[in-house]
């Protein structure tokens, strides 16, 4: 099926936008910093890359344009002729040809300047070669200004064309302007074509879709056609001629019985005879429209003879009225049936059908005598069929039960389960429990094993295996157990005391704590230590012991005094109050010190989760190049 979608063609930029886009992309996607003290091969590569990158961008965009636009020789003749009428085939091909030439010129310019750049001996010379190469490429594109603008207009118009499938089932409406073609398509499809009481309201092709016999149909509304030579017809009329020539459709030739369109029945008949060659090998129906104003029976004899002659030639004439919808469905049905029959007949005449038919052979046996041999059906089968026709089925289905019980019905599929024990049908045992398959843990002989275990236990109980009394423990073991019990109770008390304190600050180590003598003696007694001889204990002896008597210093001769008189030394002023004149100033200094310590205290409680790494290099300030007028950012 030839199906074309011209809405996917990419936008064709103007020459100025084309150049700006490409050069901007080159500046963004290639390095921008080079210095003259770099090695010459690095400088050459820097500018070669810019030239090649620009050439590749031009090449890709131009190739995309050439690929997206349809080739007139490859598409369906209907679209080829329609594009020739709307856009002029020669102009269209010239524009695409110029784009193709521009693409080749850009490639050649890049190739030449890359070759010259290999011999550049300085940064300045390589830069000038790059500048010349990009300039020549832009000049080539600038000369394609008119071609690019023309192709953009063609693209916009193509995207607005209706999607017409030339090979599907189609009904085609044609006739003089203002005879009711657009009103008919609005009635049979969901199209919304503008209808006005003047000629040439429809200036292009319109498509509507409908369903008939579960098939999809398209109805094409063509602009009105006037009766004059083909060379004198304008673009609007030629669209209708193109559709008639190329679309394999059922043609509905619409005539105005009331002659309100401004053309008599004779003129409409002459137009019919003029375009009759376009109706060859197509089902044709003459639609006599506006029968609500005037019917065929009310016409003069000469006008009635027009429709009589058409019917005698094999063209059905159907009276319709799009205002009252009389005959509209009849026309639709007749046209669709004729087109379906015509398509089947055409396929039967084709080679493809003959190839299939040649492979098929219908074997018909020849009669050997005149004796009748009807098919044999056993009497039991015949009787069963009669019972099935008269009697109801014995087994009730779930649907029958649902209808009988109504709201009380509950779907129960477990009653059909085929189990060994029928009472287990409704046991609620899951198939999967906590990721384990229940079937893996079910032993079919589990009840038998349980009975064996119960018998074994009864035998053991009868033998008195469980009647033996445990041996009495000795005194040493009882003391150990009692001591262990006291230790466990002591641990529990310690835990409770610790919970009551609930200290959250730093804890002082046990060796640094001051131990009171009474507390120590109490703890030792609770642990079972005999404290009767506590006065001779080590800690009591150490407490009573006085300081060792030092050896008396030998008296020395007095030296003559270095000074006549010396006043007694005074104590040094504390640092936290030195330099402060009064109490008020001391309080103020302490307040300032406390406020300064707040931040440090907060950071002191900071954990690993409170860490934050600040962005020391914000990209929006440090990315890009420092151009003129941008240096105040950093």
From Swiss-Prot:
Superkingdom to which the source organism belongs: Eukaryota
UniProt-recorded name of the protein: GTP-binding protein 4
Modified residues (N-acetylalanine): 2
Function noted in UniProt: Involved in the biogenesis of the 60S ribosomal subunit. Acts as a TP53 repressor, preventing TP53 stabilization and cell cycle arrest.
Record field: compositional bias (Polar residues): 560-572
GO annotation, biological process: maturation of LSU-rRNA from tricistronic rRNA transcript (SSU-rRNA, 5.8S rRNA, LSU-rRNA); negative regulation of cell migration; negative regulation of cell population proliferation; negative regulation of cell-cell adhesion; negative regulation of DNA replication; negative regulation of G2/M transition of mitotic cell cycle; negative regulation of protein ubiquitination; osteoblast differentiation
Residues with the Phosphoserine modification: 122, 468, 470, 472, 558
Organism: Homo sapiens (Human)
Modification type N6-acetyllysine: residues: 103, 522
UniProt record similarity statement: Belongs to the TRAFAC class OBG-HflX-like GTPase superfamily. OBG GTPase family. NOG subfamily.
SUPFAM superfamilies from the UniProt entry: P-loop containing nucleoside triphosphate hydrolases
Binding site for GTP: 175-182, 221-225, 289-292
MF terms (GO), sorted A to Z: GTP binding; GTPase activity; preribosome binding; RNA binding
Crosslink position(s): Glycyl lysine isopeptide (Lys-Gly) (interchain with G-Cter in SUMO2): 103, 332, 534
Places the protein is found: Nucleus, Nucleolus
Residue ranges, compositional bias (Basic residues): 544-554, 586-604, 619-634
Key words of the record: Acetylation, GTP-binding, Isopeptide bond, Nucleotide-binding, Nucleus, Phosphoprotein, Ribosome biogenesis, Ubl conjugation
PANTHER family cross-referenced by the UniProt entry: NUCLEOLAR GTP-BINDING PROTEIN 1 (PTHR45759)
InterPro entries: G_OBG (IPR031167), GTP-bd (IPR006073), NOG1 (IPR024926), NOG1_N (IPR041623), NOG1_Rossman_fold_dom (IPR010674), NOG_C (IPR012973), P-loop_NTPase (IPR027417), Small_GTP-bd (IPR005225)
Quaternary structure and interacting proteins, as annotated: Associates with pre-60S ribosomal particles. Interacts with MINAS-60 (product of an alternative open reading frame of RBM10).
């Amino acid at each position: 099926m030839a199906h074309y979608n011209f809405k996917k063609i990419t936008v064709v930029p103007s020459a100025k936008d084309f150049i700006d886009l490409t050069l901007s992309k080159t500046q963004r996607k290639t390095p921008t910093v080079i210095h003259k003290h770099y090695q010459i091969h690095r400088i050459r590569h820097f500018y070669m890359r810019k030239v090649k990158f620009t050439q590749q961008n031009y090449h890709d965009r131009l190739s995309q344009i050439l690929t997206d636009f349809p080739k007139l020789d490859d598409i369906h003749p209907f679209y080829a002729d329609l594009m020739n009428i709307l856009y002029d085939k020669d102009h269209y091909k010239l524009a695409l040809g110029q784009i193709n030439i521009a693409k080749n010129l850009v490639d050649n310019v890049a190739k030449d300047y890359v070759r010259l750049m290999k011999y550049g001996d300085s940064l300045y010379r390589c830069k000038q070669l790059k500048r010349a190469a990009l300039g020549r490429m832009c000049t080539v594109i600038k000369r394609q200004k008119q071609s690019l603008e023309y192709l953009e207009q063609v693209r916009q118009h193509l995207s607005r064309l209706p999607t017409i499938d030339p090979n599907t089932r189609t009904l085609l409406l044609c006739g003089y302007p203002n005879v009711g073609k657009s009103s008919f398509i609005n009635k049979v499809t969901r199209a919304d074509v503008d209808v006005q009481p003047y000629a040439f309201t429809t200036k292009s092709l319109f498509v509507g879709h409908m369903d008939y016999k579960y098939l999809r149909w398209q109805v094409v509304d063509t602009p009105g056609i006037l009766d004059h030579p083909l060379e004198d017809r304008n673009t609007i009329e030629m669209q209708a001629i193109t559709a008639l020539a190329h679309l394999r459709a059922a043609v509905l030739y619409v005539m105005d019985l009331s002659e309100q369109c401004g053309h008599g029945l004779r003129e409409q008949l002459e137009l019919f005879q003029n375009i009759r060659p376009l109706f060859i090998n197509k089902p044709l129906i003459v639609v006599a429209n506006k029968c609500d104003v005037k019917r065929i029976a009310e016409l003069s004899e000469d006008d009635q003879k027009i429709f009589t002659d058409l019917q005698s030639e094999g063209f059905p004439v159907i009276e319709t009225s799009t205002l009252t919808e009389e005959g509209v469905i009849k026309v639709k049905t007749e046209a669709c049936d004729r087109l379906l029959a015509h398509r089947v007949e055409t396929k039967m005449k084709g080679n493809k059908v003959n190839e299939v038919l040649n492979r098929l052979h219908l074997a018909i046996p020849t009669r050997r005598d005149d004796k009748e041999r009807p098919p044999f059906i056993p009497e039991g089968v015949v009787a069963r069929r009669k019972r099935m026709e008269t009697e109801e089925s014995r087994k009730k289905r779930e649907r029958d039960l649902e209808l009988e019980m109504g709201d009380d019905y509950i779907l129960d599929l477990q009653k059909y389960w085929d189990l060994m024990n029928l009472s287990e049908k409704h046991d609620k045992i899951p198939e999967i429990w906590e990721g384990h398959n229940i079937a893996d843990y079910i032993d079919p002989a589990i009840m038998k094993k349980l009975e064996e275990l119960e018998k074994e236990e009864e035998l053991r109980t009868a033998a008195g295996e469980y009647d033996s009394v445990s041996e009495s423990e000795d005194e040493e073991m009882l003391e150990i157990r009692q001591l262990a019990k006291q230790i466990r109770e002591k641990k529990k008390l310690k835990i409770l005391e610790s919970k009551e304190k609930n200290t959250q600050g730093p804890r002082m180590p046990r060796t640094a704590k001051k131990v009171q003598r009474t507390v120590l003696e109490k703890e030792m007694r609770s642990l079972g230590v005999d404290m009767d001889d506590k006065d001779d204990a080590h800690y009591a002896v150490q407490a009573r012991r006085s300081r060792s008597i030092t050896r008396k210093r030998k008296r020395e001769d007095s030296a003559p005094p270095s000074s006549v008189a010396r006043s007694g030394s005074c104590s040094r002023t504390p640092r936290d109050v030195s330099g402060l004149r009064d109490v008020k100033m001391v309080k103020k200094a302490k307040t300032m010190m406390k406020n300064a310590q707040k931040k440090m205290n907060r950071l002191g409680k900071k954990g690993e989760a409170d860490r934050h790494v600040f962005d020391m290099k914000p990209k929006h300030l440090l990315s890009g190049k420092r151009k003129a007028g941008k240096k105040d950012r950093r």
